[in-house]
Amino acid sequence: IKTKLSHEDAFSKYLIGQGAKINKPYGWQIKILSPESFLRKIGPVLEKRLTESKFRGLTRMLKMNFWKYELGLWFEDGKLVKVEQTSDAGRILGMNPYATIQLFLGFRSREDLEYAYPDFYVRDGLGELIDVLFPRKPGYIHYCY
């Protein structure tokens, strides 16, 4: 019997406790076509994570360099007020476009990605902030094939 459930839900944990086998999830084949739109959409989640951290009330702009373009995330008093492309050259957050999807979706941590991808980097002591905004979390993508 295949359950097609996350390994983190209560029922799956029960089945595992009864001796069920865990299959590795199939590789993620996800592409975020517009990181700008995606980050706007998850803005309330990012704001909640800030509120529950030492970064409550954050006011600053984060520049994410995606090789061909940069995105600026403007936070004011802990609220994400603007996400848009910027032309300013910045090399503080180097976002490998392929690896960043794993960060945004919680599949890999910032440290995992910095280790695996030399062109994924977080400088100027922003690692902890990125960890708060994009923590590693269990997830499951249901696929229908």
Where do the protein language model's features map onto the residues?
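Intrinsically disordered, low-complexity, positively biased terminal segments
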Residues: 1-145
